[in-house]
Structure formats: C-alpha cells, structure tokens
Amino acid sequence: MADKVLKEKRRLFVRSVAMGTINGLLDELLETRVLNQEEVEIVRGENATVMDKARALIDSVIRKGPQACQICINHICGDDPHLAGVLELSTGSQSGKCLTVQESQAVVPPFPAPQTVQDNPVKPASSEPRGSLKLCPPDIAQRLWKEKSAEIYPIMGKSIRTRLALIICNTEFENLPRRDGADVDIRDMKILLEDLGYSVDVRENLTASDMAIELKAFAARPEHKSSDSTFLVLMSHGIQAGICGKKYSEEVPDVLEVNTVFQILNTLNCPSLKDKPKVIIIQACRGEKQGVVWIKDSVGPSGNSSLLAAEDFEYDAIKKAHIEKDFIAFCSSTPDNVSWRHPLLGSLFIIKLIKILQEHAWSCGLEEIFRKVRFSFELADGRAQMPTAERVTLTRSFYLFPGH
C-alpha cells in the first residue's frame, strides 16, 4: 500500500526533498483535493525550515490514506526523478503506478536517459567551432546518488525546476582599455550554462551601481524558489577594492566590492537560494602588471566559525540559518597576478574552465572540476596565472548531472 511506502520513506523524504518539489507537491495535492487551502497554508506558513515543511507535508498526506499517498508518490516519480531515485521509487512501465524498486519487476530508471544538449541549439556568434557538453549516463547518475546521496546537493527534476544564471561583462570603458575578446567569453559561457539547464541573462557595460541593481533584481527573481542552484559570472577590469564599473578612473571610484555580491545573494537577502549552491565566477586581473588589480573576495578567515554550538547543526533541530552558506567563488588568478586574455579567442581562464566543465561535469563534482582547471595552469608556458577558489562555504559536493 502506498501509505506504508511513505511511512517507510518518511525520514529519508524529510532529509532529501527540496523546496521546489515541496511547492510542486502542495500545488498538486491542492488541485487533486487531497489537501485543502488551509492545510497547504499551514505547511507553508507555520514551518520555518525546509525539513519542517517536508515533515508536515508527508504527515498530512499519510493521514489521508493510501489513495492520497499514491497521488503524492506519482507526482514525485513524474516531476522529481532525482528524489524518486533517492527514495527508491520508480514508475511501473505497464501500470503507470509508481512503485518501490522492490515491488516492481519492470521499472524505468529514476534518472531517465538524458536528452542531447543540441535539442535547443544556440548558434555561436562566430563560425569558430566549440566543444560539446558530455552528458551523464543514467547508470552513472544513479550510482553517484546511491553512493553519495547524503553528501551531494539535491537536484530538481527538469519539469519543475527554473534554474537561473546571470552574466555581467564590462567590455567598453570610458577611461580603461577595451577588453577585446570578452564577446567570445560571453558567447561561450552562455552556451555552457544553457547546456547545463540554466536560463541565462546577460548584462553588459554597467557602472558599479548598475551592477548592484542588476544583482538585487536577480536575487529577487521568484524562479529561485523552484531552482536548485545558480551561477553568477562577473567579467571586467578590477582594482584592489573590487570590480570596475564602466566609468572607473583614478578620480572616479566606480567600483563594485566583491563582498557586496555575497551580501546580495546571502540567506538574509536572497532566502529563495538558501541551502542551494551559488557559484560565482570572476574573470579579472589581480596584479598591477596590467594597470588594474582586484583582491581576493575575503579579507581574512571568519573568527566565529569555531564558536558555533554543535546542536545548531542537528538536522532535525535547526531553527536558524547561516547568513552566508553554500557559496563558492572561482577567481581567474591569485592575488597580485595577471589574468591573460586573447583579443580574438577570449580569456584563457574562461576557455579552460568551459573546456574542463564540458569534459568532466558528467562525472566530477564542481570543486574537483575547479582543481582540474588549476592543474591545467600548473605549467606556466609563458602565460602564468593560477585560478583560485575562495570564500568556499559549500557543505556538500555539487554535481551538475548534465542532461538530467
């Protein structure tokens, strides 16, 4: 019986389900009259954390009986194959019912075969060939989840998630040299992020205040509620204080502080991205050889991390949220060193990052991918720079599962 299945999977459901799936389930259960409007509002409004909402939701459904539980299970199988895999649920190929793996003899894998990224091709701005994103085979995706499900950020099903990414690139400046090749960086990064399932917005040639406005608008997008992650790509000149706006000069301090970027996207200002990976890619020189420099995102390590009480981290007792968590910034070079950019081919860091993501995202977590990017720069070959991951607060491994 479906109610027995949900009772057995209750604890794992509470620990694994994402907010977007909870919202989808609530909408489905309201539409099918399993829950009424008051019950839905209680789940959403009277529970502070995602796990509290999940616990209230599944308990409400179980109390409604087997038919209500079956509707809930069917929705999970249809709209969140990742969660179905974690819970060992799958859709029966003959009956259309969603059964446990143990109950079904003929099942569809919880990770269906990925569609090629060329289903909706994006035409490059030039005739130059580009690489293609290697997709994650269903058996690899299932194995990774089976082995590491407790340590991996959950992904949401394609049919319900609304992933967003933002690229801000300053190419033209009033007082600084033009960043030739930046158009190639924009084109190729946009293609990559779209192939990974993100809807990408591009903003160009902004002042520091305009960049902050765009970031705040991006943080306020309602789509983040039903997303599982986000990417932010910043490409510009820089100085020690941060990222240069288009009007920067020694007399005009048109600078966006990197710390401001983190503040805009933190839990306090962007609660929709709470507990979800927020990846910040920054392409800029960090040394004086090119006349502009910017420093690392963090002035120094936090002095409070060792003072956090152990009970704050218990999965079923968390009532407070860390203001800054689940971030990673990947910078194009170490402090005091330049980042190289070809006027026709684009930035060396962006070129290598895209290539390695295309080749390894199907099997490697993001931090391992970033290590591979650093390794690709190990031999200087006359163009010395070393990309650096900073301000890392990821608590789990972030697998992109391209194609899923």
UniProtKB/Swiss-Prot annotation:
Chief location bin: cytoplasm
Q: Mind telling me which SUPFAM superfamilies this protein's record contains?
A: Caspase-like, DEATH domain
Output the PTM entry: The two subunits are derived from the precursor sequence by an autocatalytic mechanism. Ubiquitinated via 'Lys-11'-linked polyubiquitination. Deubiquitinated by USP8.
**What's the EC number here?**
3.4.22.36
* Region named Disordered: 111-132
Keywords on this record? Apoptosis, Cell membrane, Cytoplasm, Hydrolase, Membrane, Phosphoprotein, Protease, Thiol protease, Ubl conjugation, Zymogen
Modification sites for Phosphoserine? 302
Catalyzed reactions: Strict requirement for an Asp residue at position P1 and has a preferred cleavage sequence of Tyr-Val-Ala-Asp-|-
- GO molecular function annotation: cysteine-type endopeptidase activity
Where in the cell? Cytoplasm; Cell membrane
Query: What region holds the CARD domain?
Result: 1-91
| Residue ranges annotated as propeptide in the record | 1-119, 298-316
State the active site. Answer: 237, 285
Which biological process annotations from GO are given for this protein? apoptotic process; positive regulation of cytokine production; positive regulation of interleukin-1 beta production; protein autoprocessing; pyroptotic inflammatory response; regulation of apoptotic process; regulation of inflammatory response
Its Gene Ontology cellular component terms are: AIM2 inflammasome complex; IPAF inflammasome complex; NLRP1 inflammasome complex; NLRP3 inflammasome complex; plasma membrane
How this chain assembles, per its entry, is:
Heterotetramer that consists of two anti-parallel arranged heterodimers, each one formed by a 20 kDa (Caspase-1 subunit p20) and a 10 kDa (Caspase-1 subunit p10) subunit. May be a component of the inflammasome, a protein complex which also includes PYCARD, CARD8 and NLRP2 and whose function would be the activation of pro-inflammatory caspases. Component of the AIM2 PANoptosome complex, a multiprotein complex that drives inflammatory cell death (PANoptosis). Both the p10 and p20 subunits interact with MEFV. Interacts with CARD17P/INCA and CARD18.
Q: Which family does it belong to?
A: Belongs to the peptidase C14A family.
The function of this protein is: Thiol protease involved in a variety of inflammatory processes by proteolytically cleaving other proteins, such as the precursors of the inflammatory cytokines interleukin-1 beta (IL1B) and interleukin 18 (IL18) as well as the pyroptosis inducer Gasdermin-D (GSDMD), into active mature peptides.
Its protein name is Caspase-1
**What gene codes for this chain?**
CASP1
